[in-house]
Amino acid sequence: MKWVFWWGCWLMGVSGVMAQDHLVRETGPLSPEDELAALTVPEGFAISLFAAEPMIGKPINLATDARGRVWVSSTIEYPYAAAKDRWSDPQGSRVSDSRDAIKILEDSDGDGRADRVTDFADGLNIPTGVLPWHRPEHRDGCIAWSIPNLWYFADTDGDGKADLREVILGPLGYEKDTHGMISSLRLGPGGWVYATHGFNNTSVIRAKDGTSLELHSGNVFRFRPDGSRVEVWSRGQVNPFGLAFDRRGNLYSADCHSAPVYQLIPGAVYPSFGKPHDGLGFGPAMIEHTHGSTGIAGIAFLDGGIWGPEWEDHVLIGNPVTSRVNLDRIHFAGTTPRAGERPDFITSRDPWFRPVDLHLAADGTLYLADFYNRIIGHYEVPLDHPGRDRERGRIWRVAKKEGAGKRKRLEVLGTADPVTALSSTDPWERRRAAESLIEQPALGSVTPLRTALAETPDEDTHLRHALRVALKHCLTLPGAFSGIDEKDDADLAAIALAVPTADAAAWLLGCKGVPEGATDWAPRRRAHLAKHGSPEVVASLLAEEIALSANRESAQDADAFLGIAEA
């Protein structure tokens, strides 16, 4: 009955929204308190102000870390990129007189509102994507976009601010469109960082290993956090802005102009302006409706029981054109997801409400970046229009009323004890724990990772992949194989082949397990032992090969091994 009532209210409100949907809003700005009074959420939820001007500028992208802090890319300078004569160096690591920054917001007393702000990296040039992440040797850090590079900002001395600014990838395109740059950074399975490449810009991305990509306009790609490799994930879309994974490991995006949401299949091509497909057709569509908008920004996937069974497999989509947060229910037709329109999750009587990013924290709290403005269109209205607001921005916090109270501590990604999370019943938490161990391997996690891998169903391919990659990283640590007595573990045998250490070679020498379908197992095992094995291991393998060759008509395999060993 609640859904029927809510649906009726939604239908009644559509005409009102369309009537007020002008390119330049006719009303004036409201205070944060008055805007809050104009926002409506479903029964059972509460919305509150988390942060507003002057604590922040215009928020673009949001993220949370393991300590419950909210990271935000904040801009005042948009839409004008700082000229190169204001750059502190050729890389543009700092811009003079810039008010743009990556900020960290903290709710220290647990009342649901930020009471502490830190300009972690200031003097930036229209920052967009932000992902909290740091190397083990650093106190804090993030990966972020600031014209013209993807950066690693790190606090190395513990003062709470970035004193290291290092280019990961770049320079990349920004000159044609400052609202179509790199954004929506997400840490995914296997330790890759996924990102969107926006409308109209062209970028040639070169990684440290020599791999490169040329991207024009909308695309999604992924890269290693250290910039060692870059790969295209999917091609097309017009101006994707927003990425989200579901519990199965599927990746979804929000796009402007083509469709509000896509499931992104690796290697697939999606509709864009004037771009053909690759001859195989476009990736499957999952949505037929448009939510009455050409401008969609931000997406959050609800699953894993985070809001209860009635909210399982739903997506929330930011709609800054209609000043709403849309809702779709996802069902699967075979392996293809389909989106069915539901009543809007958030509506507003204030047409300045501009939700441009959504972030669902691990504790179930939804954060919304509100680019509060009279004008939202980048092309539809001149950039120098006096109605463009340059000072107001809000972040809203939405939580279920049931069990509301003090903020939970987020003890998953980046925790000192991710092993505990490996035994969680939530696949999302297990995947995040595996990702944490990829970045910070721990010797004591080898056995729990093997247990988690053995207990994970074969059909959960993304979680199994994350666990295998985490196990590979942990097995590179000295002594990691010392407590493994089993010699018939086929899964471990396949992983050990990717571990370039003498310990791995010694274990493989006595390994009896053969990975299923591994027709090239024997030559790969020999090559690994010859390259990484100690002299004792090489001698043992040579004796093994000679003994085997004595029973054959020729010693071809032994000769081949000797050639490998001498290489």
Predicted regions and their residues:
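Secondary-structure boundary/capping signal
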Residues: 8, 128, 228, 269, ...
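Generic recognition of cysteine residues
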Residues: 6-9, 142, 256, 474, ...
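Bacterial N-terminal signal peptides
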Residues: 4-16
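Low-complexity, intrinsically disordered short segments enriched for Gly/Pro and polybasic residues
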Residues: 1, 16, 563-566
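Beta-propeller domains with acidic blade repeats across secreted/periplasmic ectodomains
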Residues: 19-418, 428-432, 436
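Long, ordered, helix-rich scaffold segments
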Residues: 369, 386-391, 398-567
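A subset of signal/propeptide-processing and intrinsically disordered low-complexity segments
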Residues: 16-17, 455
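Secreted/periplasmic carbohydrate-active enzymes, especially glycoside hydrolases
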Residues: 2-5, 140-142, 422-423, 464
